[in-house]
Swiss-Prot record:
It comes from the Eukaryota. The keyword Coiled coil does not apply. Glycans are attached at residues 86, 382, 500, 530, 638, 671. Cadherins are calcium-dependent cell adhesion proteins. They preferentially interact with themselves in a homophilic manner in connecting cells; cadherins may thus contribute to the sorting of heterogeneous cell types. May act as a negative regulator of neural cell growth. GO terms for biological process: adherens junction organization; calcium-dependent cell-cell adhesion via plasma membrane cell adhesion molecules; cell migration; cell morphogenesis; cell-cell adhesion mediated by cadherin; cell-cell junction assembly; homophilic cell adhesion via plasma membrane adhesion molecules. It is a lipid-anchor; GPI-anchor. Three calcium ions are usually bound at the interface of each cadherin domain and rigidify the connections, imparting a strong curvature to the full-length ectodomain. It is found in: Cell membrane; Cytoplasm. Residues 1-22 form the signal peptide. This is Cadherin-13. By contrast to classical cadherins, homodimerization in trans is not mediated by cadherin EC1 domain strand-swapping, but instead through a homophilic adhesive interface which joins two elongated EC1-EC2 domains through a region near their Ca2+-binding sites to form a tetrahedral, X-like shape. GO terms for cellular component: adherens junction; catenin complex; cell surface; cytoplasm; side of membrane; supramolecular fiber. GO terms for molecular function: beta-catenin binding; cadherin binding; calcium ion binding.
């Protein structure tokens, strides 16, 4: 059929040419038909005629010679174009050069695909200047060359031919470009005389698919006389690359219960062969599915796109009934459009069946029991639930709620993140005497909402029965802490207060005894029976055991239980001040030069441990002695300070000045004390206070004092 089509195309073209040239009856040297269209067959068969070429030099065609651009073809003497071997790829065109003693010409054979026949016929019937008009001659004919990759030796191997219309006498061909004199060098070469192009080693289309060379014709001296013209060499792809999956790992997810035909993922492979040929035309197939239940054909892969889709019903796509939620598919990609001769590559697709919340959590039993001692807090029971959904997801994680029986908010429940159990805790201590039993109603839900048409049922609620055990609780003081105000220095044995403690265990009718637990100053005692607290020592507000006027003591209340329980009470005594401390004077030592110009010796201050109004203003006075009053005096500065002033310069010596200071308390308290005054000699900024004359001066003062007393 293909041969008939070729003949039809050639016949039509020849008829058109004959019609176009019918008026020209003179012989025109050359090919009588210059353009041919033939349909690309699956293969050109060796020695089978392809078409007939008619050449006439109008002189008898003596010494007629034909040259074909592709060395796999030749033209017989009768003009028949034949293949020298079986040829599956001849390119898009063949050029035939014919030469005799009197004429030469070029014919072009265009090879078209089956889908191009219509366009070829249109070209044949197109009325244009090319019909009947001799084609312009080409000086160098360099038709494209096609070379299959991965050819086997021997090399070099002839792959094409360059033709010069003028012949090559006195001239030679020269080839240049990438693959000749540029890297990679030495792949191609040309016979300088015949124009035969040869390849020297196997080619790899995936490395270089096309070579663009230049052909020139030079004279024997190397001068270019024709060209350059471009020579295209294309490497014909062979199926020498397997499909490869490069984007792994391949993991897809599909929700359980998804409709049949749900797309899970896409698997695509890469083939390094020519994408325009079947060598890279891939088809996909599932070789193996693991596991094979509930169906050995859970999934389908689109052979062209590589899309993996579900093919089972939503009922079978149930995660909870599956042997495992993970499926592994061995995917095969085969080139050559999936034909048996194609090369293959495989990869594994992992498909995970994702969970949806189609199973509510359910308690493992309807009623749980718990026992807790009164007064204790913490977890008292773990509530267990079952959920068939995927663990560690929101469809599995439980959320617990106390919906009844917790008016006092004594209980809380939280989820154990590892076990999903509900941890029920007492957060406020329970009292046996108030209630010995508690009943809680607990509800469990999921973090994620249930899917439509699924609801929480009776198994999603449970009852917890809690029994409170009685324990011997310690007595409780009322109030606690206790506060009282007392004046310091009250008589020993004075009653401070009576403490009161009660036993929470009202049903046990226990007795209570009291004792002192902590009394830092040992000032107090307590009656063990009635709780009366009395003083055993004088209360002193100025004691180091008193802080901010408060004294703190602790007492114990002990019941008669077995074993006994103890309660602790705190007593704060606020002490009121009384004037029981004399003022103190400072400083007690002063120094002055014997020739001082400023006779103001020192400023005295007074302080008192008591509180107002038992402190300042203070009264400063010299003691009632006539002798000292003649030597110095005291001037009041303010409520807390006074100044000692000399009445005259004194000789170097140590003097003791008797001074009294009195507070403002009722009654006031006076402190009689002495100020030691050192009179020193001062020379050149040095003060000498050695007491060489101190004994003399002191004795003089003593004698003067005695004399004044005697005279009285």
């Amino acid at each position: 059929m293909q041969h008939k089509t070729q003949l039809t195309l050639s016949f039509l073209l020849s008829q058109v040419l004959l019609l176009a040239c019918a008026e020209d009856l003179e012989c025109t040297p050359g090919f009588q038909q210059k353009v041919f269209y033939i349909e690309q067959p699956f293969e050109f068969t060796e020695d089978q005629p392809i078409l007939n070429l008619v050449f006439d030099d109008c002189k008898g065609n003596n010494k007629l010679n034909f040259e074909v651009s592709n060395p796999d073809f030749k033209v017989e003497h009768d003009g028949s174009l034949v293949a020298l071997k079986n040829v599956s790829e001849a390119g898009r065109a063949l050029f035939v050069h014919a030469r005799s003693e009197h004429a030469e010409d070029m014919a072009e054979i265009l090879i078209v695909g089956a889908d191009e026949k219509h366009d070829a016929l249109k070209e044949i019937f197109k009325i244009e200047g090319n019909l009947g008009i001799p084609r312009q001659k080409r000086a160098i004919l360099a038709t494209p060359i096609l070379i299959p990759e991965n050819q086997r030796p021997p090399f070099p191997r002839s792959v094409g031919k360059v033709i010069r219309s003028e012949g090559t006498e006195g001239a030679k061909f020269r080839l240049s470009g990438k693959g000749v004199d540029q890297d990679p060098k030495g792949i191609f070469r040309i016979n300088e005389i015949s124009g035969d192009v040869s390849v020297t080693r196997p080619l790899d289309r995936e490395a270089i698919a096309n070579y663009e060379l230049e052909v020139e014709v030079t004279d024997l001296s190397g001068k270019i006389i024709d060209g350059p013209v471009r020579l295209d060499i294309s490497v014909i792809d062979q199926n020498d690359n397997r499909p490869m999956f490069k984007e792994g790992p391949y993991v897809g997810h599909v929700m359980e219960g998804s409709p049949t035909g749900t797309t899970v993922m896409r698997m695509t492979a890469f083939d390094a062969d020519d994408p325009s040929t079947d060598n890279a035309l891939l088809r996909y197939n599932i070789l193996k599915q693991t596991p094979t239940k509930p169906s050995p054909n859970m999934f389908y892969i689109d052979p062209e796109k590589g899309d993996i889709v579900t093919v089972v019903s939503p009922v079978l796509l149930d995660r909870e009934t599956m042997e495992t939620p993970k499926y592994e598919l061995v995917i095969e990609a085969k080139d050559m459009g999936g034909h048996d001769v194609g090369l293959t590559g495989t990869a594994t697709a992992t498909i995970l069946i994702d969970d949806k919340n189609d199973h509510p959590p359910e308690f493992t039993k309807k009623e749980f029991q718990a026992t807790v001692k009164e007064g204790v807090t913490g977890v008292i029971v773990n509530l267990t639930v079952g959920d068939r959904d995927d663990p560690a997801t929101g469809a599995w994680r439980a959320v617990y709620t106390i919906i009844n029986g917790n008016p006092g908010q004594s209980f809380e429940i939280h989820t154990n993140p590892q076990t999903n159990e509900g941890m029920l805790s007492v957060v406020k201590p329970l009292d046996y005497e108030i209630s010995a039993f508690h009943t809680l109603l607990i509800k469990v839900e999921n973090e994620d909402p249930l899917i439509p048409d699924i609801a929480y049922g009776p198994s999603s609620t449970a009852t917890v029965q809690i029994t409170v055990e009685d324990v011997n609780e310690g007595p409780v003081f009322h109030p606690n802490p206790m506060t009282v105000t007392k004046q310091e220095n009250i008589p020993i044995g004075s009653i401070v207060l009576t403490v009161n403690a009660t036993d929470p265990d009202t049903l046990q009718h226990q007795t209570i005894r009291y004792s002192v637990y902590k009394d830092p100053a040992s000032w107090l005692e307590i009656n063990p029976t009635n709780g009366t607290v009395a003083t055993t020592a004088v209360l002193d507000r100025e004691s180091p055991h008193v802080q901010d006027n408060k004294y703190t003591a602790l007492f114990l209340a002990i019941d008669s239980g077995n074993p006994p329980a103890t309660g602790t009470g705190t007593l704060h005594i606020t002490l009121e001040d009384v004037n029981d401390n004399v003022p103190s004077l400072y400083p007690t030592l002063a120094k002055v030069c014997d020739d001082a110009k400023d006779l103001r010796v020192v400023v005295l201050g007074a302080s008192d441990k008591d509180l107002h109004p038992n402190t300042d203003p203070f009264k400063f006075e010299l003691s009632k002695q006539s002798g000292p009053e003649k030597l110095w005096r005291i001037n009041k500065l303010n409520n807390t300070h006074a100044q000692v002033v000399l009445l005259q310069n004194l000789k170097k010596a140590n003097y003791n000045i008797p001074i009294s200071v009195t507070d403002s308390g009722k009654p006031p308290l006076t402190n009689n004390t002495e100020l030691k005054l050192q009179v020193c000699s001062c020379k050149k900024s040095r003060m000498d206070c050695s007491a060489s004359d101190a004994l003399h001066i002191s004795m003089t003062l003593i004698l003067l004092s005695l004399f004044s007393l005697f005279c009285l």
